[in-house]
Regions:
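Charge-dense, helix-prone N-terminal extensions
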Residues: 56, 61, 73, 83-99, ...
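Short, solvent-exposed loop/turn segments at secondary-structure junctions
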Residues: 19-22, 60-61, 79
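Compositionally biased, charged N-terminal/linker segments
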Residues: 1-49, 126, 132-172
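Aromatic- and Lys/Arg-enriched surface recognition patch
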Residues: 65-144
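Short coil-to-beta transition motif at edge beta-strands of beta-rich domains
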Residues: 43-61
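Sparse, context-dependent recognition of short Cys/His-centered cofactor- or disulfide-binding micro-motifs
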Residues: 32, 38, 53, 57-59, ...
Length: 172
């Protein structure tokens, strides 16, 4: 599956399973990633084996309320420019819509991390530990079932989400 076919008009949240990423950032070894828009260059986002991508559909003027609707696991980076070998694409049933994403706001609005302006470039954003834990706890415990979407992805198993994941958002 090509990266552009996967993303379309979604925003992508990467659940990185390697907690050592925090140590790299704190030590200054990891400052930023060179993530350029694929339509401008041949460079692609750098995902690793076992990374879990959460696909979030932002609110658009002529579209229904936003939702977090799909989960896919990264198998490997391909040697060509086609992107990544991905596991099966799971549809979240039901999708997590606006009314189910009020877990961090008493005012009845979406969490700020979901409302940022889309500047049409890749950016790296690290959530705070509290945001990360709250977000993952909600997503994984919101009585959401995962169903394989026919014709998408590869094998029938997905990489499990780690106990201490790091979430990084890539805005498209």
């Amino acid at each position: 599956m090509r990266w552009m076919e996967l993303v379309e008009d979604h925003r992508v949240f990467l659940v990185r399973l390697n907690p050592d990423l925090w140590t790299e950032i704190q030590e200054g070894a990891l400052r930023s990633w060179d993530l350029l828009r694929p339509s401008r260059t041949e460079r692609l986002p750098e995902f690793g084996f076992g990374d879990v991508l959460l696909l979030y559909h932002p609110e658009l003027p002529d579209q229904p309320p936003p939702e977090l609707s799909h989960v896919v696991a990264v198998r490997q980076e391909l040697s060509s420019d086609t992107g990544y070998s991905l596991g099966p694409l799971f549809r979240m049933t039901p999708p997590i819509g606006r009314e189910r994403m009020l877990f961090s706001s008493q005012q009845g609005s979406l969490p700020a991390v979901f409302r940022r302006a889309d500047d049409r470039t890749y950016v790296l954003t690290l959530l705070t530990s509290e945001q990360r834990d709250q977000f993952l706890e909600y997503v994984l415990n919101a009585e959401i079932t995962l169903e394989i979407e026919a014709g998408k992805g590869g094998a029938t198993s997905a990489a499990p989400v780690g106990e201490n994941p790091v979430i990084i958002e890539f805005e498209w």
